[in-house]
Each structure stands twice: as structure tokens, then as C-alpha cells.
Swiss-Prot record:
The conversion to 3-oxoalanine (also known as C-formylglycine, FGly), of a serine or cysteine residue in prokaryotes and of a cysteine residue in eukaryotes, is critical for catalytic activity. Keywords: Calcium, Glycoprotein, Hydrolase, Lysosome, Metal-binding, Secreted, Signal. The modification 3-oxoalanine (Cys) is found at residue 75. Residues 1-16 form the signal peptide. It is found in: Secreted; Lysosome. Substrate binds at residues 123, 246. Ca(2+) binds at residues 35, 75, 308-309. GO terms for cellular component: extracellular region; lysosome. It comes from the Eukaryota. InterPro entries: Alkaline_phosphatase_core_sf, ARSK, GAG-degrading_sulfatase, Sulfatase_N. The active site is at residue 75. This is Arylsulfatase K.
Length: 523
């Protein structure tokens, strides 16, 4: 027993040496996780379009990761990966309804066990059983051969006036609570604290006019925040013609209700409103930073800012997430605090599963086995560190939810982004050279078959994606069949009332037949 205790103390001290801390002087840890924040806005030239003073402050005094990715571009699976430190296919977090068990171990649990005073506030969204029935059914039926609009058409909504700072009241309320907790609780603590604050912004708001099942397609802000946006810097992204789109991207464009006509003014306004919502998010980050500063905790606290995914904001003729394009999959990741390099940029691809081992290193807690990620501390520490398990040169993401009609797998390495689908045979892959094609408009997979072959081999060493795709396909059918049987005679009425109801009612019987034929192949 004594030997185990001595080894534990040795390990804690060894980890704390990474950042010149002792086991008795561990840092506080504060993580702010937004929702749908485009990571490209956190570094030049992306942040020229909108004023983000507190993100810029973190970048100047800390380290920013230039190629940080979600492990699944949708809310719940992404957060499940971040909290568990495991890839989505390992936890089988297939969609917004199927994620972690409520009792799953998270890095916050490990911090609490190691002596931290822990507190989580706001949006968590990493356990199973949540989100709307419509969202679940759309995910389960994504490979049924019909094409229905599932989202409201993206729109803008300007509220208040030039003095209206608080638009997303729910987020401001929880931010106020976090600020009060810092001001009123932390001073009396005898141990370090770990605070998690989850925000909803800049996720678009639900479009109430579309009914209770509607998704988030309203970009809402006030003149106060819109004034933070340089409107003349807001670009109108180029779109491929429908016939030139990848089949999965075309499906996404239609189901997201973006296949109709949009004027340049509409597109620019949607993007400007989205950037304004990012500015409001930055304002909440600033409130937390001010509370840490005013209580004398800032110089003893490591602060992390990230997001579960981004938002396409009309790039590739889409909004929302659910895509491996940069606007959707590229997330912010900034870390500042004692021992962290200042004004430092990390170009190595990383992802949200890296947060778990990173937080353990920050706290001087020995690493947990079975994690998919790697600690980022050796990359940003002011002290030169030799890592026994250096971070790989790639980042990996996967998607199995709604608004994409097959499972999607993305590998990001060097200048390449490789995207594979389904079993790797029936849907063609995509390959982009991001150093030459930042807008991802030129799929060069057919021009570089050797690169695709090499990257596909690497991808298969990470995940047996044909087998995973088959498992998800089987799960979707089983879940839908159970849901259908539970409804009995009300099935036709209920399925017709979901978010696709506008298109569904045009030929309800035909769509029901499509589903019945799909179910006949139940594995």
C-alpha cells in the first residue's frame, strides 16, 4: 500500500513538472464550451470579420490550435467524445439520442477524485435519451431513398437596439451564475477548482413559426452585436452546381432546406448575423475572465475555450453542422494559463478527445487507460517535454446522424483532408488539399489515387469503418422498427407530423412504402 502511495505522489509530481507546478499548487481549470463556433474565427485572417476581444486576449496570452477538429460534427456525439476521451465509434454515440450512459466516467470525475472542487454549469448534452423525436427519426431513416426537407430555411432576426447586449438570455443567465460562483465560492476553497461552463451560442435559434418540432434555423442578434461585424469583410461563398456536388453533400443541401434560391444579400446577412452571435459568445467569455481576474484567480487558472462543432453559415450551400467541411468540423481550441506558452500557434491537427488527457496533465493526474486522445501539454508547455506517446500527425472525425445519408469518416493530416463514406465502395471518397483549396471546392480524389490509397489505409488503421457503418445501419433499422411498433395505429399520423411534414404530406403513402421496403432488409 505504501509503495502504491509513493508511486502516486511521484506520478503527480512528474506530471506537474510539465508546467513547473508542485502537487500542492495545482492550477484551477476553467473550460468554456460554446456550441457551433467556427474555429477559423480564432486566428488570422478569420477574426478580421468580427471583433472577438477576449478570444484575441486568450490567443495573445496563451496558445491557439490552428487545426482543431470535432470528433463528430453534431452536438451530443461530439460532447460524448470530449467528455469520455474516446472516439465516437468506441462509445457508439451514433446520433443526438444515442450517446453516453449517465454514469459514464468523465475527466471531471477524475479531477474530483484527485481532490479538485468541481462544478459544471450550462449545456452538457453528452448522455443518451435527449433531443427531439424528429431528430432521432431523421437519423434512423437517413438511408431511406427519399429526399425530404428536414430543417427550416435559414433566416435572420434582428431584435432590440444598439444597447441590447443580452440576446441569448439563457446563456447570459448561466454565465451570470458562473460569475457569481467564481466570486462567492472560490475564495473559501482550500483545494483547486475545476469549472465547466456550457453555452448554447452561437448555435442558431429554433424557428418557432415552424412549430414545436422545428430545428434551429434562425440567426438572431441585436444591433449591438451586429456592430461588431465588419460587413464589408463578410464574404459570399462560392457554391458548386448541383450536378457537381458530391451525392452526400447534395442530400445535405436539400434536407437542410438550402436548395432554393438565395440572394447574395440573404447569404451575407446570414453570415453576418452568425458572426454577431459569435461576438456575443465572446462577450460571455469576457465575463468569466473578468471574474477570474477580479478575484485574483486568473494567474492561477488554466482557461480553455472550445466548441462542439462549427457552423457552415451558407458555405457549400448549407448551414448548421453535420459535414466534414471546415466550417462544420473545425473547432476553436485556445488554452491560456500558468506554464502555457504565450502567443503560440500549434499547426498540428488535434481534436476534442485530446482534452481529456490534457486536463489530466494540467491537474497532475496519471493518465487513464483506453483514451483515444493525447495530451496537448507537451505541445504548449514553456518547459521542453519529451512525451512517451507523442501526438500523432492526424486528427479523426466521424458522423452517423441526420442530414447526411451515410456514415462519414474524415482524416486530416498535413495539407490533406480525406473523407470516406459507408463501406468505402458504394460512395466515392473526397480528397482536398487545404493548402491550395481552402474553400474545399475541388475534390481531387480521382487525380491522386495513390494519396487516397495511403490515407485510406491509415484511416482503416484507426477505425474499421466498413464494419462501423454496417453496425450503424443495423442499429438505425432496429431503433426505427421499435419506435414504429410502439406507436401502433398512430404511426402514420405521428411520422407525418415530424419536421419533414411539409414535404411528407405531398405523397405520404409513397414515403411510407419507401420505409417499409427499407425495413424488409432488416439485418
Amino acid at each position: 500500500m505504501l509503495r502504491v502511495f509513493v508511486l502516486l505522489i511521484f506520478n503527480v509530481n512528474a506530471y506537474c513538472m510539465y508546467l513547473n507546478w508542485t502537487s500542492h499548487d495545482r492550477p484551477n481549470i476553467v473550460m468554456i464550451m460554446s456550441d457551433a463556433f467556427d474555429g477559423r474565427l480564432t486566428f488570422q485572417p478569420g477574426n478580421k470579420v468580427v471583433q472577438l476581444p477576449y478570444i484575441n486576449y486568450m490567443r495573445e496570452l496563451g496558445s491557439v490550435f490552428l487545426n482543431s477538429y470535432t470528433n463528430s460534427p453534431i452536438c451530443c456525439p461530439s460532447r460524448a467524445a470530449m467528455w469520455s476521451g474516446q472516439f465516437v465509434h468506441l462509445t457508439q454515440s451514433w446520433n443526438n439520442n444515442k450517446c453516453l450512459h449517465p454514469n459514464a466516467t468523465t475527466w471531471m470525475d477524475d479531477l474530483r477524485k484527485s481532490g479538485y472542487h468541481t462544478h459544471s454549469m450550462g449545456k452538457l448534452d453528452y448522455t443518451s435519451g435527449h433531443h427531439s423525436v424528429s431528430n432521432r427519426v431523421e437519423a434512423w431513416t437517413r438511408d431511406v431513398p427519399f429526399l425530404l426537407r428536414q430543417e427550416g430555411r435559414p433566416v435572420t432576426d434582428l431584435v432590440g437596439d444598439a444597447s441590447t447586449k443580452r440576446v441569448m438570455i439563457k446563456d447570459w443567465t448561466i454565465t451570470d451564475a458562473a460569475v457569481q460562483w467564481i466570486r462567492n465560492t472560490t475564495a473559501s476553497l482550500t483545494q483547486p477548482f475545476a469549472l465547466y461552463l456550457g453555452l448554447n451560442l452561437p448555435h442558431p435559434y429554433r424557428t418557432d413559426s415552424l412549430g414545436p418540432t422545428a430545428g434551429g434555423s434562425t440567426f438572431r442578434t441585436s444591433p449591438y452585436w451586429l456592430n461588431k461585424v465588419s460587413y464589408n469583410q463578410v464574404s459570399v461563398p462560392k457554391w458548386l452546381r448541383f450536378k457537381d456536388m458530391h451525392p452526400v453533400d447534395y442530400y445535405s443541401t436539400v434536407t437542410k432546406n438550402c436548395s432554393g434560391h438565395f440572394t447574395e444579400e440573404e447569404i451575407r446577412n446570414i453570415r453576418a448575423f452568425y458572426y454577431a452571435m459569435c461576438a456575443e459568445t465572446d462577450g460571455m467569455l469576457g465575463e468569466v475572465m473578468a471574474a477570474l481576474r477580479d478575484t485574483g484567480s486568473l494567474n492561477k487558472t488554466v482557461v480553455l475555450f472550445t466548441s462542439d462543432h462549427g457552423d457552415l453559415a451558407m458555405e457549400h450551400r448549407q448551414f448548421y453542422k453535420m459535414s466534414m467541411f471546415e466550417g462544420s468540423s473545425h473547432v476553436p481550441l485556445l488554452i491560456m494559463g500558468p506554464g502555457v506558452k504565450s502567443g503560440f500557434e500549434v499547426s498540428l491537427p488535434v481534436s476534442l478527445v485530446d482534452i481529456y488527457p490534457t486536463v489530466l496533465d494540467l491537474a497532475g493526474v496519471p493518465q487513464t487507460g483506453g483514451l483515444s486522445g493525447h495530451s496537448l501539454i507537451p505541445l504548449i508547455s514553456r518547459v521542453s517535454i519529451h512525451s512517451a506517446e507523442p501526438h500523432p500527425a492526424w486528427a479523426f472525425s466521424e458522423y452517423h446522424g441526420c442530414n447526411a445519408n451515410t456514415s462519414t469518416y474524415m482524416l486530416r493530416i498535413a495539407e490533406w483532408k480525406y473523407i470516406a463514406y459507408a463501406d468505402g465502395l458504394n460512395v466515392p471518397p473526397q480528397l482536398f488539399n487545404l493548402s491550395k483549396d481552402e474553400s474545399e471546392l475541388r475534390n481531387i480524389a480521382s487525380q491522386f489515387p495513390d494519396v487516397c490509397q495511403d490515407l485510406d489505409k491509415l484511416l482503416r488503421s484507426i477505425v474499421d469503418y466498413p464494419s462501423v457503418s454496417k453496425s450503424v445501419h443495423r442499429y438505425n433499422k432496429q431503433q426505427f422498427l421499435e419506435w414504429k411498433q410502439s406507436l401502433g395505429d398512430s404511426y402514420s399520423q405521428v411520422i407525418a407530423s415530424l419536421r419533414w411534414h411539409v414535404d411528407w404530406k405531398k405523397d405520404a403513402k409513397s414515403y411510407e412504402r419507401d420505409i417499409d421496403e427499407w425495413l424488409l432488409g432488416l439485418d
